[in-house]
Amino acid sequence: MMAKATMAFCFLLMLTTVMLPTEGKTIAGRTDCEQHTDCSAASGPVYCCQDSDCCGGVDYICTNYGQCVRHF
């Protein structure tokens, strides 16, 4: 039982490490979406990754490909 739990933990740790971008200025190397004025939004601030790909706000992060991803 303990071996399965350890294997699962190691797998999740490895997966998390691989999935995280290496560039960035925030915790775990993720880059916060920066506020950007060129994107039009219905309400609230709009954030973009690398001046493109509009995000919905501060609850998003940018991948190292410049895509917005919601973080939980």
From Swiss-Prot:
Chain positions listed as propeptide in the UniProt record: 22-30
UniProt PTM: Contains 4 disulfide bonds.
Keywords attached to this entry: Disulfide bond, Secreted, Signal, Toxin
Cellular localisation: Secreted
Annotated signal sequence range: 1-21
GO MF terms held by the record: toxin activity
Expressed in which tissues: Expressed by the venom duct.
GO cellular component, one term: extracellular region
Comment on protein domains: The cysteine framework is XI (C-C-CC-CC-C-C).
Family: Belongs to the teretoxin H (TH) superfamily.
Protein name listed in UniProt: Teretoxin Tsu11.2
